[in-house]
Amino acid sequence: VALIAGGVGITPIRALLEDMPGAPGDIAVVYRSARAAEVILRDELDELAARRGAEIHYLIGEPRSPSGDDLRALVPDIADRHVYVCGSTEMTRATRATLRRDGVPAAQITTEGFSL
C-alpha cells in the first residue's frame, strides 16, 4: 500500500496509516507540503510509521511538473501497490495521471480531492 498526501490531506491518510492492516514494510507514506512549517502531525506520523514499520517520506516545496521520477525513486514497486491519494483536487488529479502513466492500474488507485 502507498499513501500519498498533499497538505492537509495528510489527516485522512494518517488514519489509514494507523488502522490499515499490513506487515512491516508493506506501507509507504509520501507527504508533500509547500513549506516545512506547514507540515502537520510530523511527530505523530513519525511515531506511527516507526510502530507500523512503514516508510515515510516528506517532500517539501512546490511540485515540479507531475513526473513519476520522484515517486518511483521513493516507492520503486508503486505499480504493484494499492495507492490512496488525498489532497487538493488539482493534486489528486495530477497524481492519478502520474500513477497511471507509471503503470498503476486504475482499480488500484483511490483518491479523495478537496478544494479550500
Question: Could you say what each language-model-derived stretch is?
Answer:
Residues 1-116:
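FNR/FR-type flavoprotein reductase catalytic core
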